[in-house]
């Protein structure tokens, strides 16, 4: 700023004292004298040696002077544009002011995909959403719990799709339904093919109506059947005399027998090997919503291919005004700018030193009318004139200092809702979450309709020998002649206990008696014991209370230690300790204990213990695909500080199951005080 003011003062001084050698810009020629930046060449009167001094360091910026009165408007000049001057030096930094908001910039290029963040915590369970469209068939899940469900209605058969291209040679399929007999062809009979592999054993058919057959002739003795299940011990018969063993007879001719009456259904055979996958059946009707047990978390998948860049997002909200940045480094010297407008006349500067005499130049053309000179002395005050027209707008002043921060304005009205943005690129699937709690066992879905018969497959290769077939139906042969009486045999082992008999008829009703001392709504005493009326409490009867009901929140507790039922339903007296799973008697008397457990995965064997000794056992044999239940109850006489708990006697039968929706519980209460 100080340098520019000095240059303007020198320029004005040259105009005043060197008017004889001044020419208009229109007829001015380029001078050979070089000057500092922003120094216009001009002719000088004196002659001397051309010298160029070194540019001194810029002085400190001076104080801002008062703004002068605008001078009178000059006549329009007709000057020719001068030569383009050298670029000026870098000006001082301006004052920092809050600028106006610029136009929003173009959306930036999509950034590179960032690193996967840390796994977040599991969020709260959301509300169930609306039912979505039916998705594609998924991978068969693990076998769920088989529960008897209500069969749904059979869906209509779907339309047959177009015939696909022939696939690769597959494994032998399940034999299809026999098709209709085709028309007689015209061809040479081919060679008989090799015998195919035996097909898988079909499902057991429904028992047919009893036929009326004729007894056929005895057939050849069949192969010895597989060892059957052990039957019930029969009545001991008379011992016969062992006869001599005869020679084996020759096999007779093959007899043609007639089918006899249908015998009773035989025992279930050995389950056959898993058959080949059959053709895909028609999609069944959607079943009831099940609550399946979530599977184990899968392996982390490979990183997918990089997706295409997304669409530009909507315009963001206006951010807060940033803090003015630090002064940047000096930029490169720019190109020469256009000649600026004529500045205001500056104040008279100090007279400069006399310059050296320059060379005499050629005579110039007569110049144009000079500019208006300095104003003369003040004249006599004249009469006030009429109000003139408003003058032209003055030049803008220098930017002022930054004002104080104003008060926060009132919040503006909400703007209009913007247009809906472009749908973003689908995100990448996150890592599988932790395994959730066991769900409610789902109901068994309905059996789907049979699939369409598949095309006959190509001839397969010879397979390995098959497993032995199921046991044949054992038929009773003709009774042979009684042999001679044999010697008495040794005493046999004791047979297994027989099945429990049917329940007996109910007994006659007993006579109701009212003990002496009984009063309705009050407690009574009998043989030194006090009993409490049903529905009465301690406040009415004066009898103390000791009761608890607890639930197991986690499945499969440890064996040979007390089971810790950790979820409390009622334990106001704190006689049950959930940390140890043990109930401690504080009031001597008769207690009633009951427990209800579930079995899943394996058998369950639970026992009720008193002071380290089992009082009663409960055993349940687990059936695959079902959720079994077992329960037990007992009345126990307890003294003070006696302890009662539930425990699994061994680790082999430890299938005790409990979850959020399937509860295993343990209860007890005092009903008579001794």
Curated annotation (Swiss-Prot):
Q: Name one GO cellular component term.
A: collagen trimer
Coiled-coil stretches: none
Record region (Nonhelical region (NC1)): 513-674
| Residue segments, region Triple-helical region | 53-512
Q: Record's Pfam families?
A: C1q (PF00386), Collagen (PF01391)
Residues given in the record as Ca(2+) 2 binding sites: 628
Put simply, this protein is called Collagen alpha-1(X) chain
> Which gene is this protein's source?
COL10A1
């Amino acid at each position: 700023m100080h340098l520019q003011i000095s240059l303007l003062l020198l320029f004005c001084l040259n105009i005043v004292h060197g008017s004889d050698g001044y020419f208009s810009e229109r007829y001015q020629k380029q001078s050979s004298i070089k000057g500092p930046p922003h120094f216009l060449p001009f002719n000088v009167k004196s002659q001397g040696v051309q010298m160029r001094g070194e540019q001194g360091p810029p002085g400190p910026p001076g104080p801002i002077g008062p703004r002068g009165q605008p001078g009178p408007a000059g006549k329009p000049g007709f000057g020719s544009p001068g030569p383009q001057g050298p670029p000026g030096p870098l000006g001082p930094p301006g004052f920092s002011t809050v600028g106006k908001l610029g136009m929003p910039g173009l959306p930036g290029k999509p950034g590179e995909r960032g690193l996967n963040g840390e796994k977040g915590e599991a969020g709260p369970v959301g509300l169930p959403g609306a039912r979505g469209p039916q998705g594609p068939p998924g991978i068969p899940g693990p076998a769920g719990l088989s529960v008897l469900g209500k069969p749904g209605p059979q869906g209509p058969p779907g339309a047959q799709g177009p015939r696909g291209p022939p696939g690769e040679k597959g494994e032998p399929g399940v034999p299809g339904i026999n098709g209709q007999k085709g028309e007689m062809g015209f061809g040479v009979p081919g060679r008989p093919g090799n015998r195919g592999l035996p097909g898988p054993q079909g499902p057991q058919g429904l028992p047919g109506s009893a036929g009326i057959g004729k007894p056929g002739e005895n057939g050849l003795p069949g192969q010895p059947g597989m060892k059957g299940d052990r039957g019930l011990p029969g009545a001991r018969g008379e011992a016969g005399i062992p006869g001599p063993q005869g020679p084996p007879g020759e096999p007779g001719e093959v007899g043609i027998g007639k089918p006899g009456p249908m015998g009773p259904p035989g025992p279930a055979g050995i389950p056959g090997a898993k058959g080949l996958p059959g053709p895909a059946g028609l999609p069944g009707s959607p079943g009831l919503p099940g609550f399946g047990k979530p599977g184990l978390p899968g392996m982390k998948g490979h990183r997918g291919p990089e997706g295409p860049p997304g669409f530009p997002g909507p315009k963001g909200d206006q951010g807060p005004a940033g803090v003015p940045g630090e002064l940047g480094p000096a930029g490169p010297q720019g190109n020469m700018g256009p000649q600026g407008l004529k500045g205001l006349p500056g104040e008279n500067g100090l007279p400069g030193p006399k310059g050296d005499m320059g060379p005499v130049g050629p005579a110039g053309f007569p110049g144009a009318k000079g500019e208006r000179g300095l104003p003369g002395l003040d004249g006599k005050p004249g009469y006030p004139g009429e109000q003139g027209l408003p003058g032209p707008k003055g030049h803008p002043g220098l930017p002022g200092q930054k004002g104080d921060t104003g008060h926060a304005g009132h919040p503006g009205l909400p703007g209009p809702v913007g247009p809906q943005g472009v749908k973003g690129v689908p995100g990448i699937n996150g890592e599988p979450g932790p395994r959730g709690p066991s769900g409610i066992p789902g109901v068994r879905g309905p059996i789907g309709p049979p699939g369409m018969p598949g095309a006959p497959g190509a001839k397969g290769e010879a397979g390995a020998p098959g497993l032995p077939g199921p046991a044949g139906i054992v038929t009773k042969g003709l009774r042979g002649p009684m042999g001679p009486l044999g010697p008495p045999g040794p005493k046999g082992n004791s047979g297994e206990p027989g099945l429990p008999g049917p329940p007996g008829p109910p007994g006659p009703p007993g006579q109701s008696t009212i003990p002496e001392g009984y009063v309705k709504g009050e407690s009574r005493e009998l043989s030194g014991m006090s009993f409490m009326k049903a529905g009465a409490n301690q406040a009415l009867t004066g009898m103390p209370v000791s009761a608890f009901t607890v639930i197991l929140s986690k499945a499969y507790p440890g064996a040979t230690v007390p089971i810790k039922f950790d979820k409390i339903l009622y334990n106001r007296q704190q006689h049950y300790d959930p940390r140890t799973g043990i109930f401690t008697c504080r009031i001597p008397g008769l207690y009633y204990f009951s427990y209800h457990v579930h079995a899943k995965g394996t058998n369950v064997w639970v026992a009720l213990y008193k002071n380290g000794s089992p009082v009663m056992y409960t055993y349940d044999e687990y059936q695959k695909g079902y959720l079994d239940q077992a329960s037990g109850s007992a009345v126990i006489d307890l003294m003070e500080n006696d302890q009662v708990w539930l425990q699994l006697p061994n680790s082999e039968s430890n299938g005790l199951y409990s979850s959020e929706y399937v509860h295993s519980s343990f209860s007890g209460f005092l009903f008579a005080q001794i």
